[in-house]
Each structure stands twice: as C-alpha cells, then as structure tokens.
Amino acid sequence: MEFLGTTQTASYCGPKKVCGLQALPPAGQDPVVQECYQPFHLPGYRYLNAWRPSVFYKITTQQTCPEECSSSRRPPTILPSLRSALFCRYTQRDWDRSNDLQLRGAEASRLWAGRLTGDSLRIMQDKDQLIHQMQEGTSRNLNQRVCDIGFWKSELCYELDRLLTESNSMDTLKRRLECAAEEMNNPLQVALECLYNREKRIGIDLVHDNVEKNLIREVDLLKCCQDQMRKLAKRIDFQIRDNRDAQHALERDIEDKSSSQYIDESCFNLRNTSDSISFFHGMEKFDGTVSIPETWAKFSNDNIRHTQNMRANSIRLREEAEHLFETLSDQLWRQFTNTNLAFNARISEETDVKNKLQTQLAKILQEIFQAENTIMLLERAIVAKECPLKVAQTRLACRTRRPNVELCRDVSQFRLVNEVFTIDDTLQTLKLRLRETQDALQLLVMTKSRLEHELAIKANTLCIDKEKCMRMRKSFPSTPRLTGYTCSGIGSGPYTNQVPRVSSCGGGASCGGGLSCGGGVACGGGASCGGSAPCGGSALCSHPVSGSCPGSCFAPVC
C-alpha cells in the first residue's frame, strides 16, 4: 500500500524494491453489474465504508522481492508533494514547555473541580433543608385547608338535610292539594251529571226544585274549593322551585367542597416517594383562582342564609294549607248532606251493540296475539340469517388478503358471492314481510282502539239509561280524601274502596273503575258505568267535562 502526500521519514515511504520477477499480465476487465435495487437508509445511517480516511489513497498489489533484489535500492527521484522541509518541526525546548503547560493545566483543572464539588455539596445540603421546610409548611397549610373545608361541608350538609326534609314536606303538601283538588272532580262531575240528567226529564218533572238548587250550590262550592287549592298548590310549586334552587346551590357547593377536599387530601398525602407525582412545567405561572378565603367563606354562608329563608317561607305555606283543608272539608260535607236529602233516580239500559262489539274485540285481540307471534318469529328468522351472512362476508374479506396471483376468482369465490347475495335477498324478503306484518298489527291495534272507544260510548249510553243520579250519590269522598291524604288511582272509578259505590247494575261488563255494569265487556277504565267508572274526557259524551286526566272525572251522565 502506498499513500500519497506523506513525509520522507515515514517507514512506508522507503525506496521501492526492484524485483526481478516479470510483471503479471493485466487481468481482464471485470464485468459491470448494475444493481436493480437501491437500498433505502434512514437519516443517521452509517455506510460500511464510513471508517475509511478522507485523504486519497491507492491500493496496490506487490510481490515480495527476494533477498538479492535489496542491493539495487535507490532513493526516489521525486519527493512527496506535501513535504515542505527535510528537518523536524519542533525543538526539545518546545517539547518541554508543552509538557509543563499540560501538567499545570491539569493541576488547575483538578483544583477547580475539587472546589466546585465542595460548593455543590454545601448548596445541595442547604437547598434540601430549605425545600424540606417549605414542604412541611405547605403540608400544614393543606391540612388546615382540609379542616376548614370539612367544617363548612358539615354545615352545608346539615342545612341540606333540613332543607330536604322541608322540601319533602312541601312535596307531600303539594300532592295532598293536587289529590284533594283531583278528588273533588269526582263529586263535581257527579253533581254536573245529576244536573244534566235532570235536564232530560220530561213534562212536569222539569221543576226547579230544592234538589236542583242544592246541586247548583254544590257545584259552585266544589269549583271554589278547587280554585283555592290549585292557587295554593301553584304557590307551593313556586316555593318548591325556590327550595330546589337553594338545594342545587347547596349540593353544588357540597360537591365542590367534596372535590376540593379530596384533591387537598390527595395533595396532603403526596410524598417524595409517591408514585403519582410528575413534572407539570409552567403550573407555577398559571393562576386560576377565583376567590380568596374571605369570599370563599362568605359564599357558603350566603347559601346557608338563603336556605334558612326558604325554609321559613315553606313553613308559613304549610300552616296556611292545613287551615284551608280543615275549613273546606267541613263545608263540602255539609252541602253534600243537604243535597242528598232530595234526590231520586230512574234507570234504563241498552246492551245489544255492546255485546257484539265485545265479541269482535275478542277476535281482534286474538288476531293481535297471532300477529305479535308472527313478528317475533320473523325477527328470530332475520337474526338467524345474520350469522351466515357474517360468515360469508368474513370469508370474502379474508380471501381479499391473498397475495398476488393467489387472488383467484375460483369456484369458492363465486359460491361465496352467490351465498352473500342469496342471504341478503332472503333478509330483505323477511324484513319486507316483517314490515307488512307490523303494519297489519298497527291496523289491528287501531281497530282495537276504535272498538274500545265504541265500547266506552256504548257503556256510557248504558249508564245514561241504567244508572241515574241516586246511584252516583250513594257516597261522598271521606275527610282524608278531601284533605289529600289518600288519592284515587289513575283509571280507577270515583270513591274507590267505598263499599256503597261499588255496585252491580245488572250486567257482566267489568269496568276499570272497579264496578260491573250492564253489559258483557271489559272497558279498561275508559267506559262510564253506573256512575262509578271514570271517563277519559268529553269524547264519551255530548257534554264537555273538565277532567284533567283519566280516572279523575265522570262522563256527563254517568
């Protein structure tokens, strides 16, 4: 190997040995091979020849000369181009000075490093002590903060419990007023029905007697009582809303304090050896606080004072409601007793059409049952077809990942595609049939509703002819009902659980109001029967009624 640009004194630049051997003939030129693949390397990749020096170099092959060739050595005629002189660059003095400088620099660096190490140890001890003291102080502050939060939280919880108790009392009172006003719909509708029935009297019986006068006074008194109770219930509802606002404010404050207490307790329990600690850069520069300790305590104190004012208002409303209950119940019972002293009733009936409608309703119900079973079977069939469709589609999806020429459109591929189309067509057919069955079921349900409505109308007509005024007025709501302690259920007849009102009227129809009336049909609570079953509103009769919900009023002539 011969390097270019070296000094004459280098051992590898000696005179070239002349060898007596003949030079070998030049080898044939190697064929040029071009790589079709160029490798891609990520940034920072070091190639295999990265170790080679950057100076020019040349590799030569040389045969070793025998011993007799050494006598013919001669100095080279051309010196290397980088050689500037034939003498050394430095003197002994320069060499000594350089060594001395290196030793003194190393000593100075060592002394400086020793002083720096000592100072660093002292700084670490001082900062460790300072940080430990600051951490202890912060922990004490966090503990005090947790105690303050716990105190205000307990005060808020105590006030919240009292407010919840008062709100429950107000809710109960509101329900009592609503139930009492709703309960008065029954005797009110009875009185109105009696007036309507008496208007159907013929001839000399159309007399404005004491019964009619008492009925009018009873209707006016019942409406007046309802208005007073509803107005008071509306005031109580507004107060409940105010209580709920105060409750929400307390709950939000308690929730915030619970979260803050949990966070501060977690921060207080954090130690240097905790697993949940981490770096959060820049948090010391972010100030998201919105209050100071004084405003923080004042906020909770204002919530407590506001809650106390709401409770005082609620207590005054409850006292007013109790006085109203006591006064109105006495007046209603006195007027009801005076009205019942002068009443008589007439009875008639009509059942033929109702029985036919009931028979048709039974057939419709059976057909609805069959349609529901068919829908269930169709839905099961659709669900059962989904799994084979998933299998076929999954197989197709998996076969799309075959490599290269293996993506063959073979018989399996054709069969899978055909299977998917067949199953999908089957599903569409079943879904179409399911929709048709559901439409048929909807039509049956609508027919059933119409039949039930017709049954209610026929039952109402039957009641007009069968049950008259005295059957409706055999009882009156008790004092607990008038004061709202008990309330008849939705869909039940008036005066439910009152033995005199539950009477039979010569038929086999079972009414949702708890009475049987002359027919053979079940009227689901919507038919008027014997004056004791509820009416859903004015749709069952030719006279308007003011019932607010099913089960709360009578049909006009029921």
From Swiss-Prot:
Residues 347-381 form a coiled coil. Specifically expressed in testis. Ubiquitinated, leading to its degradation. Deubiquitinated by USP16, promoting its stability. InterPro entries: Tektin-like, Tektins. One of its GO terms (cellular component) is sperm flagellum. Keywords: Cell projection, Cilium, Coiled coil, Cytoplasm, Cytoskeleton, Flagellum, Ubl conjugation. GO terms for biological process: cilium assembly; cilium movement involved in cell motility; flagellated sperm motility. Belongs to the tektin family. Microtubule inner protein component of sperm flagellar doublet microtubules. Interacts with TEKT3. This is Tektin-5.
